[in-house]
Amino acid sequence: GCGKTTLLRIIAGLEEPDDGGQVIFNKENVTKLLIEKRNVGMVFQSYALFPNMNVKENIGYGLKVRKLDTKQIDDRVSEMLNMMSINDLSFRTIDQLSGGQRQRVALARAIAVRPRVLLLDEPLTALDAILRDRLRVEIDSLLRSLGITAIYVTHDQSEAMALGDRIVVMSDGKISQIGTPRNIYFHPENEFVADFIGTINRISGN
């Protein structure tokens, strides 16, 4: 891979950056903070839901770890169930859920902790095309309404163009270009970005 997931893990605190590398949250250097101190939410491609817990318990897990009292946990979980329209799934186990339902539970669990930043690692890859398109719109609308900063890793160009306010194109562990979707599409800085993002007319010249 080009390093997308590794970069996400560094931001989360699961891996350390190379010497000199820093992770900054809103002007605060969090490079030395442990993951539990960074207050990040994470949604993985595999969802990483706990099979021994029901939906309600999965959503409340991060709150329990943060030692919120029972009423706060119940209130926040209820809020998430309503927000994600999965109230009727509260007591189902994970193996009783469809792919789309698991995705909603994983997102609810990540948002429940009110993270400073939400990290999503190709969360829609395992879903069929129709469901993927629908959830893409739902996630975009939800995160914008909540005002949550999100970093969304994807290899799908159309997904990046549809969701991103700013896009980072990576190749071989390095950043090839950073910019708005429009800027990257119309003004690619090199051949790799042009090839990756859109259809191009390439003309050789002297």
Protein language model regions, located:
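ABC ATPase nucleotide-binding domain helices that frame the ATP-binding cleft
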Residues: T5-L8, V105
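A position-specific signal in ABC ATPase nucleotide-binding domains
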Residues: E15-P17, K64
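Conserved ABC transporter NBD signature motif
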Residues: G20-N29
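ABC ATPase nucleotide-binding domains
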Residues: N39-G41, L49-N206
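Serine-hydrolase catalytic-loop signature spanning alpha/beta hydrolases and amidase-signature enzymes
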Residues: S46
